[in-house]
């Protein structure tokens, strides 16, 4: 790592490390935070191309078409089936929720703390436009016994699955290193898979090596 020419920062958690490497090792970094907004994803790649002196040319026509196809298929199958998610699953839970809501999905609950960085605008938009969505702070010892059970829903993240006792859990943790169009499409495909096939939450938690 000390011989790297460039650090690409995709998570706020790594910013201090990037700053220290820039200061101590003279390794520059560029902020390209992960996003679930197709326009922002394109801007990230354009920004990276600009940084590299326009030596890189990207064509995402196939990826965008695949994403549109996945959204349509998922919407046709899920219809108004409830979706809940948490901040352990994705870096920016409010942005991802906003993406789902904008595409007509029935997001019911978001288990997350205060929004960070680019997530603030999406947080405010959800509060303003989608007043039926419940915003819940998960880190409360009484939360497990709160009336948040919603077994018939797709829960994205182990935490939301645990708190709702969902039968359909997407065992995503820290985005599993996913990024860009591929990452967004992958998450949507996992939502579809979890809807079609009931999941064993206990098995997902044990596979992730977590202690509840």
Positions of the model-derived regions?
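An N-terminal assembly and electron-transfer interface module characteristic of large anaerobic redox
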Residues: 1-212
